[in-house]
Amino acid sequence: MFQAAGAAQATPSHEAKGGGSSSTVQRSKSFSLRAQVKETCAACQKTVYPMERLVADKLIFHSSCFCCKHCHTKLSLGSYAALHGEFYCKPHFQQLFKSKGNYDEGFGRKQHKELWAHKEVDPGTKTA
C-alpha cells in the first residue's frame, strides 16, 4: 500500500513538469524558425548554412565556393585579395594587377639609373 501511494504521487508531479517543459520547447522552436534568414552564396546562389558560412568583403560564401577567379584555388580569409568584387589568391593578384613601371617615374622623380650616370661623370672632375 505504501508503494502504491508513492507511485501515485510521483506520477502527477512528473506529468506537471513534462507538460510545462514541452510547451516551453514548442515556443522556443517556433521563435527560432522565425528568426532565421536564408542566406545565399555570392558565388553559386545556393543557401548557405551556418557551419559552411564565410564572409569576405561583406559577401557571404560557402567555404568551398570561396576560390581564386584565376586558378580556382580554395581561399581562406588570410590568403585572398579582392578587386571590384572579384577574389584572387595573393600570387595571382600580384601577377595580374601589380603596377608595371618605375616607382621613381610614378612619383615624378628622375630614374635612379640617371642619378648614378651623373655621379660617374662627377668623380672625374673631383679633386682629391
Swiss-Prot record:
<feature type="binding site">
    <location>
        <position position="62"/>
    </location>
    <ligand>
        <name>Zn(2+) 1</name>
    </ligand>
</feature>
<feature type="region of interest" description="Disordered">
    <location>
        <begin position="1"/>
        <end position="25"/>
    </location>
</feature>
<keyword id="KW-0007">Acetylation</keyword>
<feature type="binding site">
    <location>
        <position position="65"/>
    </location>
    <ligand>
        <name>Zn(2+) 1</name>
    </ligand>
</feature>
<keyword id="KW-0440">LIM domain</keyword>
<dbReference type="GO" id="GO:0051017">
    <property type="term" value="P:actin filament bundle assembly"/>
</dbReference>
<dbReference type="GO" id="GO:0005886">
    <property type="term" value="C:plasma membrane"/>
</dbReference>
<dbReference type="InterPro" id="IPR001781">
    <property type="entry name" value="Znf_LIM"/>
</dbReference>
<keyword id="KW-0963">Cytoplasm</keyword>
<keyword id="KW-0539">Nucleus</keyword>
<feature type="binding site">
    <location>
        <position position="89"/>
    </location>
    <ligand>
        <name>Zn(2+) 2</name>
    </ligand>
</feature>
<comment type="subunit">
    <text>Interacts with ILK.</text>
</comment>
<comment type="function">
    <text>Acts as an activator of the protein-kinase ILK, thereby regulating cell motility.</text>
</comment>
<feature type="binding site">
    <location>
        <position position="71"/>
    </location>
    <ligand>
        <name>Zn(2+) 2</name>
    </ligand>
</feature>
<feature type="binding site">
    <location>
        <position position="44"/>
    </location>
    <ligand>
        <name>Zn(2+) 1</name>
    </ligand>
</feature>
<feature type="binding site">
    <location>
        <position position="41"/>
    </location>
    <ligand>
        <name>Zn(2+) 1</name>
    </ligand>
</feature>
<dbReference type="GO" id="GO:0005634">
    <property type="term" value="C:nucleus"/>
</dbReference>
<feature type="domain" description="LIM zinc-binding">
    <location>
        <begin position="39"/>
        <end position="99"/>
    </location>
</feature>
<dbReference type="GO" id="GO:0015629">
    <property type="term" value="C:actin cytoskeleton"/>
</dbReference>
<feature type="modified residue" description="N-acetylmethionine">
    <location>
        <position position="1"/>
    </location>
</feature>
<dbReference type="Pfam" id="PF00412">
    <property type="entry name" value="LIM"/>
</dbReference>
<keyword id="KW-0862">Zinc</keyword>
<dbReference type="GO" id="GO:0046872">
    <property type="term" value="F:metal ion binding"/>
</dbReference>
<dbReference type="InterPro" id="IPR044115">
    <property type="entry name" value="LIM_LIMD2"/>
</dbReference>
<feature type="binding site">
    <location>
        <position position="68"/>
    </location>
    <ligand>
        <name>Zn(2+) 2</name>
    </ligand>
</feature>
<feature type="binding site">
    <location>
        <position position="92"/>
    </location>
    <ligand>
        <name>Zn(2+) 2</name>
    </ligand>
</feature>
<keyword id="KW-0479">Metal-binding</keyword>
<protein>
    <recommendedName>
        <fullName>LIM domain-containing protein 2</fullName>
    </recommendedName>
</protein>
<dbReference type="GO" id="GO:0051015">
    <property type="term" value="F:actin filament binding"/>
</dbReference>
<dbReference type="GO" id="GO:0005737">
    <property type="term" value="C:cytoplasm"/>
</dbReference>
